[in-house]
Regions:
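Arg/Lys-rich amphipathic alpha helix in sigma70-family domain 2
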Residues: 60-64, 74-95, 168
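Residues within helix-turn-helix
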Residues: 149, 160
Length: 186
């Protein structure tokens, strides 16, 4: 059954259809929220719950002229934007990183794992350092696998702007991570 057909079934009160949509999207949306909300797992889980609660309460909000995947990521993106406004993102951004770094396993003594962790931390920090619009575009493209067209729909911008944001984000990340070469370090 397509996602769009499942949404029609949800509108009719079909619990199994909701379970199927949840099964298809919950994990991916959790990963998306984790990246967009400073790796705050509790907040990300709350956002996934809230998003699916909206789907159950108001399935008629689904825009049938769009694909479900594009629509659900638009909703998720808007939830993140609202959170950014509440949190004064620029001032609070380091808190999520501090929590992330505190989880680092200091007892690890396998060199490859240590190097991979350093790279992942540097990548996460660089991703967080990107401004919101470039981070959103990069995350949707490279971490969530959306097409340029789908990203344009989610962010409500034209495809040329998406390409520009992706170019800038990639250039910034490449420059900030140039000291790492994970292929050689394996």
């Amino acid at each position: 059954m397509t996602d769009e057909s499942l949404m029609q079934a949800i509108s009719s009160g079909d619990k199994r259809a909701f379970d199927e949509v949840y099964e298809r999207y919950a994990a991916a949306l959790l990963r998306y929220f984790m990246r967009m909300l400073w790796r705050d797992r509790e907040k990300s889980e709350d956002f996934v719950h809230d998003l699916f609660a909206k789907i159950v309460r108001k399935p008629e909000y689904f825009d049938t002229s769009r694909s479900f995947k594009t629509w659900v990521y638009s909703v998720a993106n808007n939830m993140c934007k609202n959170e950014y406004k509440k949190q004064e993102v620029r001032k609070g951004m380091s808190n999520g990183l501090d929590n992330h770094y505190s989880l680092y396993d200091k007892n690890t003594n396998v060199m490859n794992e240590v190097q991979d962790n350093f790279f992942q931390e540097a990548f996460q920090k660089s991703l967080v350092d990107l401004d919101d619009k470039h981070r959103e575009a990069f995350s949707l493209r490279h971490l969530e696998g959306l097409s340029i067209k789908e990203i344009a729909e989610v962010l409500e911008i034209n495809e040329g702007t998406v390409k520009s944001r992706l170019f800038y984000a990639t250039k910034y990340l490449a420059e900030s991570l140039k000291e790492f070469n994970p292929v050689e370090n394996r």
